[in-house]
């Protein structure tokens, strides 16, 4: 009985939320209907477990194991495998050992690396020593006030 009252309340509130235009009534008057007086007794309901409701009804997963998902049946596992340029031989590393990786870094051309100097300019920026004196033309880390 309680479920029937709740279902009726949901139905009435849904009808009030989306009113349909009726002949002879202005469009705004459709929202002005009041609830059924029998449904007003729902305000005095106490909380607690509803009758007929099992304790394990609200589970975080679907306990209905007979109905599987579609992708379990028709999806090819080979399609789902992650592919990259290094996965030709299963999970073989791109470099067999650490020495091979260091050889790759030193023997390959430098412009292939993301940290390569793009303009091939001089990377020597001079002495980065903090100095409090104000010397023109030299880099300073901080001012005298610091």
Curated annotation (Swiss-Prot):
Residues 20-34, 58-80, 104-146 form a propeptide. It is found in: Secreted. Expressed by the venom duct. Residues 135-146 have a biased composition (Basic and acidic residues). Keywords: Cleavage on pair of basic residues, Oxidation, Secreted, Signal, Toxin. Residues 107-146 are annotated as: Disordered. Residues 1-19 form the signal peptide. GO terms for molecular function: toxin activity. The keyword Transferase does not apply. The modification Methionine sulfoxide is found at residue 40. GO terms for cellular component: extracellular region. Found in injectable (milked) (IV) venom. This is Linear conopeptide.
